[in-house]
Amino acid sequence: MDKSTVYFTDFRCPVGTSQLDKLKKLCIAAGIKDIDMDGKFVAIKMHFGELGNMAFLRPNYAKVVADLCKEQGGMPFLTDCNTLYPGSRKNALEHLNCANLNGFNTITTGCQIIIGDGLRGTDEVEVPVVNGEYCKTARIGHAIMDADIFISLSHFKGHESTGFGGALKNIGMGCGSRAGKMQQHASGKPAINEELCRGCHRCAKECGSDAITYVNKKAVIDYDKCKGCGRCIGACSFDAVYNPNDSANELLDRKMAEYAQAVCHGRPHFHIALVQDISPNCDCHGENDAPILPDIGMFASFDPVALDQACADACLKATPIENSQLGEHLAEPG
């Protein structure tokens, strides 16, 4: 198998050149203009950010990609699917309001926004997963599968369950309908180590399903309500919330990869990732901690796996920021 090519540019900008200029040149160098877009619908998948989060990609970047598509005769639209857990993006109306409040609209992005799985997150297509081992079919947002061409625009950052969130997570989890997200998260649900639990209530505040209560100042999970999203794991500062299934995160990763394959298979696709504002957790949180690594640059490729690998390799070579979650953990003895 031939090696895939990943293109890169850093964020350094001499006078007269902007990051937006560099993103456009990167996409062109990586081959976006080799895709025949004339008269075709182009889905640009990105994350609009949860309300309160400030680490998500700016709408200006989306406009660069949308404008490139329009220059080639394409009809682009930005898209994402509704969330499994309650929040500001659990249905299409609130999702669109969230996108607007975070700066995404027709003026700032140059195109329309369509929520991929409809009003309630039930407008889905069951797509076969070619040679799927963990998922025989994937439940994908209908509007996303209706598009002729698929482009992912991803913010590369940390993630409490998958280690990092990049192109594969943006595509696989992000394009899943609410039922599709449930299928991927079904690998395992968290548990509480009572000896480590401080009764601080952070996990309960983070839980969007009201699945965590307290008995004798210790957290208790209602598994009938728990969705298995893992947000409570990232919220706990004392390692009291954990996944008892040692393979749960690996299964989640594998299911996401199969979902990503279902989204991309059989049509032209192109992928972009910006490694900046590298927060330790997902942009699905209603807050973001300080970046754990310095801004690195922008990547583009026709191969989302190679893209994620290149981003991860670049992050592993970077020096952690001292006054950050990662820097503090590395400084701790043992």
Question: Which residues are covered by each model-predicted region?
Answer:
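Terminal amphipathic helices with adjacent charged low-complexity linkers/tails
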Residues: 66-67
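Extended, low-polarity segments enriched in aliphatic/aromatic residues
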Residues: 2-61, 71-80, 85-334
